[in-house]
A protein has these predicted regions:
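Hydrophobic transmembrane alpha-helices of multi-pass small-molecule transporters
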Residues: 62-65, 177-181, 206-211, 281-284, ...
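Helix-terminus/linker motif at the lipid-water interface of multi-pass membrane proteins
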Residues: 28, 32-50, 120-127, 183-190, ...
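Short runs within selected transmembrane alpha-helices of multi-pass transporters and secretion channels
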Residues: 71, 140-158, 166-174, 195-208, ...
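Small-residue-rich hydrophobic transmembrane alpha-helices
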Residues: 50-110, 147-166, 271-335, 369-383, ...
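Transmembrane helical elements of multi-pass membrane transporters/channels
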Residues: 18-37, 139, 150, 173, ...
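Interfacial/gating helices of multi-pass transporter permease domains
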Residues: 18, 41-61, 127-132, 192-193, ...
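Short alpha-helical transmembrane segments in multi-pass integral membrane proteins
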Residues: 1-20, 78-143, 187-241, 297-364, ...
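N-terminal transmembrane alpha-helices
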Residues: 7-44, 58-73, 77, 102-109, ...
Length: 447
């Protein structure tokens, strides 16, 4: 029995915890990339530069989620074939996905670079930070293929039960990013451009090492395979496209909601940007648990160990509850200190008020996001994509309607009131679909 097969052999809570923890730590260090930019820019350049970097965050997260969703979609099939020990099919999916999604990343990178000014203007970015925001975004898109490749390869690693290698690479590149941020921003005085360039270089190094290590791992599975299979690409896209939409739901919501925040001014945007970084840290914990559930479910489904799927779902809910309590305690006790970490001495009373109010509200409702992500992870692992997609679109619609209609009329507080309402509605729809489609009913998996 391969050491990578523990997801189908060990007790579900133990297996999922061992598997998910490196992914959770990886999510933290993924945010270190962006937080390092924000903290260092905020401390050494000022709150306007922080607002410029923060103004890009919602948009860059959408493109990150395209990479994550594409990887998760391919990873479901990789996990299923790995669980069934069909290594030839597994390697065909890997090769086909890497070729297809690398081409996609180049196209998206060119698109983003060319239309950076148009997109930031469309988000109603304040005029005093627009040019710096566009500069940051263009450097980001120049390195987008590196980011895309790293995220795809990271998902491939986790699909075969290996979550420690991408964590190690991410820790290395995060530390490198911090040192380069300090050198380029504080040392060379390159400002927003230096922060973006430091991130690009660190991501490129991480992607290169990931590819070499993953190539070595795949050579251990001695099976013939096709380098590109159109039918397998279609099968991958059937899961990847809804996964991209699901992964993007949160970020698309943030991007459009940011357009609601921007007219409130640069200081309100700085406070919102500071809290959004914190929200991203905790959100990605729950996203990671949901993403860990998918290969657990898919591997056990491929191995025909159906009884373990429900136990794995319950184990994920336990992990979600633990981290929701942790998020609440951290935010309630340290929200002022966390805000000052980003805003520094230049932050106004308005910036601190927006940041503190938003952060405190989120602390009460992260559990909704956790159970939503775990439920979505089971549906995705089983390939039940229709209700999965509907639930996430309802989530987005609720968040946007509350923010767009109420915030301009009644105040900025309605921006964060909309967030848990969408999470709760998403969970209710996903859970109802899951109750009807547990894998004892094999026909449900073909939805």
């Amino acid at each position: 029995m391969s050491k990578d097969e523990y997801l189908i052999t060990d007790p579900p809570l133990k297996a999922l915890t061992v598997f998910a923890m490196p992914m959770i730590l990886g999510s933290f260090f993924q945010q270190v990339y962006n937080m390092a930019d924000s903290i260092i820019v905020g401390q050494f350049v000022g709150s306007s530069a922080l607002a410029a970097v923060g103004a890009c965050a919602a948009l860059t997260n959408v493109f990150i989620c395209v990479a994550l969703g594409a990887g998760v979609g391919a990873g479901v099939l990789v996990s299923r074939y790995f669980g069934a020990k069909n290594y030839g099919k597994m390697k065909t999916i890997v090769s086909t996905s890497l070729i297809s999604f690398l081409i996609l990343s180049v196209v998206l990178g060119v698109f983003g670079f060319c239309f950076s000014h148009f997109m930031m203007s469309g988000l109603q970015t304040p005029a005093d930070i627009l040019e710096e925001a566009v500069l940051y975004l263009r450097v980001y898109f120049a390195g987008f293929p590196f980011l895309f490749m790293y995220n795809i390869l990271s998902t491939m690693f986790t699909s075969i039960g290996e979550s420690k290698i991408p964590l190690g690479l991410l820790i290395f590149s995060s530390i490198l990013n911090i040192f380069m941020d300090l050198w380029m921003v504080a040392g060379l005085g390159l400002g927003v451009f230096g922060a973006a360039l430091a991130t690009l270089i660190a991501q490129g190094i991480s992607a290169g090492f990931s590819f070499l290590i993953f190539l070595s791992r795949m050579r251990q599975y001695k099976s013939s395979f096709s380098r590109f299979d159109r039918q397998e690409l279609y099968s991958t896209l059937r899961i990847a496209v809804p996964s991209v939409l699901q992964q993007s739901t949160v970020s698309i919501g943030m991007m459009i909601v940011q357009a609601v925040v921007n007219p409130f001014g640069t200081q309100a945007l700085a406070g919102y940007a500071a809290t959004m970084r914190v929200e991203n840290v905790f959100s990605l914990i729950f996203v990671s648990i949901g993403n860990a559930v998918s290969p657990f479910v898919s591997q056990n489904f491929g191995a025909k160990k159906i009884e373990r799927i429900k136990k794995g779902y319950h184990a994920a809910l336990v992990l979600d509850l633990c981290f929701a309590v942790l998020a609440f305690v951290v935010i309630e006790t340290l929200h002022t200190q966390i805000s000052s970490l980003f805003l520094g001495k230049d932050g106004t009373a308005l910036a601190y008020q927006v940041s503190g109010d938003y952060m405190s509200w989120l602390g009460y409702f992260f559990i909704f996001m956790g159970i939503k992500m775990a439920t979505d992870g089971v549906l995705r692992g089983l390939g039940i994509m229709r209700p999965f997609l509907i639930a996430n679109m309802v989530n987005l619609a609720i968040r946007l309607s509350v923010a767009l209609i109420c915030a301009p009329r009644f105040g900025i507080a309605f921006v964060w009131l909309a967030v848990p309402a969408g999470w709760l509605a998403n969970f209710l729809i996903s859970y109802a679909a899951l109750r009807r489609s547990w894998p004892e009913d094999k026909a449900a998996v073909s939805q």
